[in-house]
């Protein structure tokens, strides 16, 4: 109530969320205390660097309704994984944020029929690729304006990097010639859209790991992903 009646409009409210994985007693709390100012209004310039595994996901964010209308957000219909677009495309329109250090959302993962289950994601890989390409398009199209806000651009670029990694490792995990070709095509698409962004991503740790040659290289890629799953607690 206090924020709603203030002189500045609150564009995005952020809170913690908890991964609760089926069969595991330990819960993984995703919080932002060392990244965002706590319980006060702030802007992108006030944010610290987002570490790997800490991103603003749908479980942790509430946008101002008018902002979503003004930014023209339109999610693809009959498509899974569009939550990545939901927490990506409105960001250039976000000026004022507030971080509520409370475990507000509990995300239950690990069920076999869940949309983020690895096997299910591989079966819907074309939808994951579609979302990834839309994110590439959006970042490249907005880049000239985004680079003026260094912290915002860095965050959006890093978030696209993790989505590229997820798409790549799922295609590698499938292992079919068709899916390996789709992985190659996805990286070529990024290269065609923005060669500088492609080189930054391709020469990074995650991009390099996802593009190691041969069967042995692909095995290393998957093992690296498994380690990240254990470290960050995601599905």
Where are each of the predicted segments found?
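Inter-domain helical "communication" segments and dimerization helices
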Residues: 9, 22-37, 47, 126-130, ...
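Short, charged, amphipathic alpha-helical segments
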Residues: 150-158, 180-184
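Donor-binding/catalytic cores of nucleotide-activated saccharide
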Residues: 1-98, 105, 109-122
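Inter-helical turn/loop segments and adjacent helix faces that build the functional surface
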Residues: 75, 142-151
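Gram-positive cell-envelope targeting signals
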Residues: 1, 73, 91-94, 100, ...
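Membrane-interface aromatic/basic loop that binds lipid-linked glycans or pyrophosphate carriers
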Residues: 172-235
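Catalytic core of nucleotide-sugar-dependent glycosyltransferases
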Residues: 102-111, 117-146, 163-166, 173-196
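Amphipathic alpha-helical repeat scaffolds of TPR domains
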Residues: 154-170
